[in-house]
């Protein structure tokens, strides 16, 4: 169930401060964050945000189409390596 519109977007305060500081200074270094739950807002457009996926920080370049989505959607946490192959078919 999506978040109610009357509540507005959620963004962690520490991330908001980092984003405002990066926009103000014009810094192009990625903004590191562990806050996967924060929503992407228009202030973040053009920034690279390094989102933690549980093992490392995945760089995410924010574009207009991403507004309203959560940061965690763009940093996958699981790696899919495929199903186990049939051993008999492999030998041939």
Swiss-Prot record:
One GO term describing the cellular component = small ribosomal subunit
Question: Would the keyword Ribonucleoprotein be found if you checked this record's keyword annotation?
Answer: yes
Q: From which domain of life does this come?
A: Bacteria
Keywords (A to Z) from UniProt: Ribonucleoprotein, Ribosomal protein, RNA-binding, rRNA-binding
**What are the recorded Gene Ontology BP terms?**
ribosomal small subunit assembly; translation
Q: Which Gene3D superfamilies match?
A: 30s Ribosomal Protein S19, Chain A (3.30.860.10)
Q: Which GO terms describe its molecular function?
A: rRNA binding; structural constituent of ribosome
Q: Which InterPro entries match?
A: Ribosomal_uS19, Ribosomal_uS19_bac-type, Ribosomal_uS19_CS, Ribosomal_uS19_SF
* NCBIfam families per UniProt: rpsS_bact
Q: Which family does it belong to?
A: Belongs to the universal ribosomal protein uS19 family.
Identify the PANTHER family for this entry: RIBOSOMAL PROTEIN S19P FAMILY MEMBER, SMALL RIBOSOMAL SUBUNIT PROTEIN US19M
Q: Per its database record, what is this protein's job?
A: Protein S19 forms a complex with S13 that binds strongly to the 16S ribosomal RNA.
Q: What is this protein called?
A: Small ribosomal subunit protein uS19
Q: Which organism is it from?
A: Aeromonas hydrophila subsp. hydrophila (strain ATCC 7966 / DSM 30187 / BCRC 13018 / CCUG 14551 / JCM 1027 / KCTC 2358 / NCIMB 9240 / NCTC 8049)
Source gene? rpsS
């Amino acid at each position: 169930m999506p978040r109610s519109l009357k509540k507005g977007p959620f963004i962690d305060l520490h991330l908001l401060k980092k984003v405002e500081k990066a926009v103000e200074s014009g810094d192009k270094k990625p903004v590191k964050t562990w806050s996967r739950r924060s929503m992407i807002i228009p202030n973040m457009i053009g920034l690279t945000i390094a989102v933690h996926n549980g093992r490392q920080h995945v760089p995410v370049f924010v574009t207009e189409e991403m507004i309203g989505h959560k940061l965690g959607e763009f940093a996958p946490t699981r790696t899919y390596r495929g199903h186990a192959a049939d051993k008999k078919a492999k030998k041939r």
